[in-house]
Amino acid sequence: SKKGTVRANHYHPIQEQKVLLIKGQFISIYKDLLKKDSIKITHVVNEGDLIVTKPNVAHTMVFTKDSIFLNLVRGEREHENYGITHTIKHVFVEEEERKMLLENYKLECRCCSSKNLKRVVSLGYQPLANNLLNKKNSKCELYPLEMNLCKECFNCQLSITVNPKKMFSNYLYLSSTSKTFVKHFETAAEKYIKEFKLSHKNSYIIDVGSNDGVALKPFKDKKYKNILGIEPAKNLAKLANKNKIKTFNGFLEMKNIRKIKKNADLILASNVFAHSDNLKEMAECMLKLLKKSGIIVIEVQYLLNTIKDLTFD
């Protein structure tokens, strides 16, 4: 099969099927048709992998490389390929989804570039956060919500990267709606001021992925004048600027560095690295904006505590 093509889009009502990938790579998409609450799941099949498809499991292969595989079906083959006992067509990966998977699927770790990724959990296909519909029959874009673990550097990450412009140009989550978040950033600001000896007259503070300005507001309330948010969502940057929290509307990337004032004493990045597909470029940009004696504070989710404390919904 050639790179970019699709095979299968069917299921076997009786036979079990085994596929041994000799060369290449493909994304396997499957769903158990007998289970009412079954979800559509994806995973990457690499050279040497053997996958077993049980009866009544709809499956499709989207090829990311030119591939050669052995297709083994247990059962009599003296009949047409499509028939009542052997293979029944079930198209559940359309052209639009094929393109989405080929464009957005992550085949290597965002941190160390290893291809040794292990699937931890699949929650099926989901819409973007807070992407609520106005009309009952409206269609919304769905993406696999699945988490992988890199077996080399142990970074946990999603299997899909959504186009950041689609995700953040008009972001639908306001951080200030969470009282817990507001209190957290108020406490954090007090800690940073004391620990890093920040001056409300001279210290320059940047918050990356500043949302509506929730992390910078405590500094503003304490009369810190030299603060800057960096926020790609136009609606949130506009709201923050309206609330007198100076905010640059754009992504933190090399092409935007020249537009942003440098020599920051403190750069904050709270819950923002998990949203980035290019972690190294983001880190390099921060270093270019930081003064030599400056400090970067990065806040990221830690999976063990997330599970232990049930801090998810």
Put a short name on every predicted segment:
Residues 280-295:
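A short glycine-rich, Lys/Arg-flanked "PGG" loop and its adjoining helix->strand segment in the class I
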Residues 268:
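A conserved beta-strand element that flanks and buttresses the S-adenosyl-L-methionine
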Residues 102-180:
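N-terminal juxtadomain amphipathic helix
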Residues 1-14:
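Conserved short histidine dyad/triad with adjacent acidic residue
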Residues 14-27, 31-33:
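Glycine- and acidic-residue-biased ligand/ion/polar-headgroup-sensing regions
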Residues 33-54:
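Short acidic-glycine-tyrosine-enriched beta hairpin
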Residues 62-99:
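Double-stranded beta-helix
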Residues 298-313:
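Short, glycine-/aromatic-enriched active-site segment of Class I SAM-dependent methyltransferases
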